[in-house]
Regions:
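Divalent metal-dependent catalytic cores for phosphoryl transfer on phosphate-bearing substrates
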Residues: 5-116
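Charged substrate- and nucleic-acid-binding regions of tRNA-handling and nucleotidyl-transfer enzymes
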Residues: 100, 104-139
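Active-site glycine- and acidic-residue-rich loops that bind
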Residues: 2
């Protein structure tokens, strides 16, 4: 949660980021491990979102919980298939679900979650270079 305190001074954003941070990866132990993935309803983010629905009513927070890995998946598609638009289609789907009003919240969470010291920061750099209408944040 240190990154949440560093990335913004906005109290509402901090509260939302803390909720997502605490819940988003708690159900990895239930996730289907077969690859390629056979059933996306058994993704840890779906389990986390369903759990969060019991306590959180704000759809934008639930969407960020459920979709928290989408930017990483889009980056991975871009790396694997750079000659196609697959990554951009995935990002467009993400932003259709989130809505423009919550793109910044998603980005801030993605950056907080990635900059924990044990993950490659390249997906966030790609996101920052690719996505328009976000205010870049520094950690």
């Amino acid at each position: 949660l240190d990154n949440v305190d560093k990335i913004t001074t906005n109290a509402i954003l901090r509260e939302q980021l803390r909720l997502v941070s605490i819940i988003h990866d708690n159900f990895k132990h239930l996730e289907e491990t077969v690859r390629p993935r056979q059933d996306w309803t058994k993704h840890h983010a779906v389990y986390a979102m369903k759990f969060a629905q019991n306590f959180i009513k704000e759809h934008h927070i639930l969407n960020v919980i459920e979709l928290h890995d989408e930017a990483y998946y889009a980056w991975h598609l871009n790396r694997k298939y750079p000659e196609t638009n697959r990554a951009f289609h995935r990002l467009n789907g993400l932003f259709e679900r989130l809505g423009d009003d919550y793109k910044q919240l998603y980005y801030l969470f993605f950056k907080c979650d990635t900059f924990t010291g044990d993950k490659t920061e390249t997906p966030v750099r790609w996101f920052e270079e690719t996505v328009s209408n976000i205010d870049l944040a520094h950690l």
